[in-house]
Amino acid sequence: MAAKDVKFSRDARERILRGVDILADAVKVTLGPKGRNVVIDKSFGAPRITKDGVTVAKEIELKDKFENIGAQLVREVASKTNDLAGDGTTTATVLAQAIVREGLKSVAAGMNPMDLKRGIDLAVTKVVENLKARSKPVAGSNEVAQVGIISANGDKEVGEKIAEAMDKVGKEGVITVEEAKGLEFELDVVEGMQFDRGYLSPYFITNPEKMQVELTDPYILIHEKKLSNLQSILPILEAVVQSGRPLLIIAEDIEGEALATLVVNKLRGGLKVAAVKAPGFGDRRKAMLEDIAILTNGELISEDLGIKLENVTIGMLGTAKRVTIDKDNTTIVDGAGAADAIKGRVEAIRKQIEITTSDYDREKLQERLAKLAGGVAVIKVGGATEVEVKERKDRVDDALHATRAAVEEGIVPGGGTALLYATKALDGLKGANDDQTRGIDIIRRAISAPVKQIAQNAGQDGAVVAGNLLRENDETKGFNAATDVYENLVAAGVIDPTKVVRTALQDAASVAGLLITTEATIAELPEDKAPAMPGGGMGGMGGMGGMDF
């Protein structure tokens, strides 16, 4: 075990604060519409240019182990805010720095750190209540676009594309961001349910130009197990042929003989048919097949449910208006499922999302939810160079998370004013003792930091701007850093998602509280490297040639 270095009280706290300041000072220059870029050197490839707080924070590693502890804890604030709200990482970092600075000053003045933390927690609870009370639900796609524009640093095209995507796939729909080949933004929307399984044989193709299978008004047979021969489904195949409608078979697999028979029947024109493998694996596959059954008003043919293939009737098959299959994906559009049944299934999946502890499971459940409730939209981000594409993609990701947060918990006026005006919620609030009251004052001061930093990045005096706003006492009014004007921020489209502001404050206060109550820090001592062997050959060996043997 390597030897450790231990620092105590004032020495420990000063080192931690230095680390906090280094990271926060690098991150906070990106805040607001006039925030600056940060260039990050890479060990390979071109440097990365970004205005994304969490990206900057993740790149910072300090040489001094004790300073690094402070930097890493603030980095944790940015990461946690990013995970929970997807945006607001720079605001969270600015708040954490402000709380730590004020808190450590108070500790140095002899106040009790535990009481300070209790006061901080009390004040944060009050501010969060105030934010929730002032929050307004998002009204229409125009406000969704505005949230996106603000989060993407004033990029109008980004906000509008996200609003359009949300319009098309709904609040539950999946929106993903990819890099495009060209220069422009593109939006691809997949209607209906899509899963990543293509046709089992190219002989099923009905549209050779697009290399796709297109089935109109098909029956859909959903089978949990493998199909190795068609003997058991001959009665149902005959019934489908007589109906004159196409058939889609979804099964775990369709093996040699069964597949060959289907292909021959398709080529002879007797049966319009296509077959695909079931999506997913294990229990997830069964759940996805049940989703498809509910969406298409069919039944999952499963021995667990006591249904055998021989007993399947045409009434057990699902139907849809259209099915499109290419070599990679199958898309079912306009399934005949009952709205109530689909709604019930959506609610069941939502409950599973709430109780699951695995991020992977949550992501897969959300995908299933989107496929049932909405659709899938892909925003493709273009640019002239790889560096530009990556920077724009960062902004689109931020904007997308911010708009989702806005839809979830509503919006408050932006530009840091929501927190600034929340200081009124702390008027008259007292702790159980003077130290707790000082903790409340720390939050009162800290929540004005984002407004001051946004103004400072715009070339204004932050303290003057914050003072002007508090003097005016008009909660709708704020400082629009993009135009250097005091105005109604909601009317001007400068709005923040309540969830982002709330999460930023809670995460910042949580980690700052831990730092304030730290009395000792432990870090590994750097190892002394052994001196290298001297270079050159072994001297004095040249005379060995004269030895007698």
Curated annotation (Swiss-Prot):
GO terms for biological process: protein refolding. GO terms for cellular component: cytoplasm. The keyword Chaperone applies. One of its GO terms (molecular function) is ATP-dependent protein folding chaperone. It is found in: Cytoplasm. InterPro entries: Chaperonin_Cpn60_CS, Cpn60/GroEL, Cpn60/GroEL/TCP-1, GroEL-like_apical_dom_sf, GROEL-like_equatorial_sf, TCP-1-like_intermed_sf. Keywords: ATP-binding, Chaperone, Cytoplasm, Isomerase, Nucleotide-binding. Its EC number is 5.6.1.7. It is an enzyme of class 5 (isomerase). The keyword Ribosomal protein does not apply. CDD domains: GroEL (cd03344). It comes from the Bacteria. Forms a cylinder of 14 subunits composed of two heptameric rings stacked back-to-back. Interacts with the co-chaperonin GroES. Together with its co-chaperonin GroES, plays an essential role in assisting protein folding. The GroEL-GroES system forms a nano-cage that allows encapsulation of the non-native substrate proteins and provides a physical environment optimized to promote and accelerate protein folding. Belongs to the chaperonin (HSP60) family. This is Chaperonin GroEL. It comes from Rhizorhabdus wittichii (strain DSM 6014 / CCUG 31198 / JCM 15750 / NBRC 105917 / EY 4224 / RW1) (Sphingomonas wittichii). The lineage of its organism: Bacteria, Pseudomonadati, Pseudomonadota, Alphaproteobacteria, Sphingomonadales.
